[in-house]
């Protein structure tokens, strides 16, 4: 052993910087944005990331001789400049598939964004994108039902789904909460939603909410003749309680439940998605806490990665921002991760932030959910950006209507159908948005009042996290 093993510390780049390596189809590929400490060569920083996120440690160890390090190690195979940023660079790293447990997003993230993010040689580190190989994708369950099945279950075709979050999101009793749900659904919405932080608080225990909401949904269905639904948030203190809530929602014959996938965790989310698949339930996903992770342009995980991981872990709908509302997200970036939620193949396109080709095979797609600070004036832009396979959710833009939630729901429904009709007739709905909405308002006093109420409301703030393109 002494002839083959040299104790001590050697530079990471001696082992993990392999510029001649050609990635395999079965490799998991990752793109990191790296900002190293002053004086540390790029190759050493990039190799350190590859090492610490795969097989390496700070010292040479004798037990390397007990395995095939050349087979298992991560390899940094390319370094690129970041446009407009002299401090940072992109490091492209290939990981052999055998480093990861089959179907486990939890395991993938534990490796790629684990201890390496606290590495002293780095000032900042951001995971920009992942190329999941088909060999890994085939081990993941993915969306419990997917876009096509969800449309069939809800009997909604040819337009986006229309919904809203119940407001105020905290403080209502179960009965009053159910009353608001009923008003929204009878007014014309397809779906209503628990907010992310409604679980089972003293003012409203989860079982009361579920029962009153189920009553409201069924009454609205009887009155309108349409299929209605409400996202019942099953996020809970323990997995056991989460499944208990899901089972009760099923007993009440509710079509869809909800989970906060980042705060709840990927293990819980994958388990709940598997349960939904077996029990014929739809699963709505909220992304609470995402901005803590993805908003800093140099450190963390880009949301496109979190969106890809959700499609693999399982969810039928995912919040993606709005572009035009109150939440962060520019148009091209948002379209980039919407593509990865819905399409079967997404090509590399740096103008949309996609660093790799991504083949999703036959995995079902996920509805993109636009929610946060939107109202009727935004409807043409939302339809143009998100298309039909989306869910447009107006919280304040429903409940803030001067005539109440039912009128707000009616205004949104009329606005949506007017925009869809105009688009189908070949009109440029973004350029002609005012004419389309004002024309529809002639036949809808609810829409006319909504247009007047929100005519001055805009959220014109610059995006913090911008695409690195010139």
UniProtKB/Swiss-Prot annotation:
Mg(2+) binds at residues 193, 195-196. Binds 1 Mg(2+) ion per subunit. Keywords: Bacterial microcompartment, Calvin cycle, Carbon dioxide fixation, Carboxysome, Lyase, Magnesium, Metal-binding, Monooxygenase, Oxidoreductase, Photorespiration, Photosynthesis. Its EC number is 4.1.1.39. GO terms for molecular function: magnesium ion binding; monooxygenase activity; ribulose-bisphosphate carboxylase activity. Belongs to the RuBisCO large chain family. Type I subfamily. The basic functional RuBisCO is composed of a large chain homodimer in a 'head-to-tail' conformation. In form I RuBisCO this homodimer is arranged in a barrel-like tetramer with the small subunits forming a tetrameric 'cap' on each end of the 'barrel'. This is Ribulose bisphosphate carboxylase large chain.
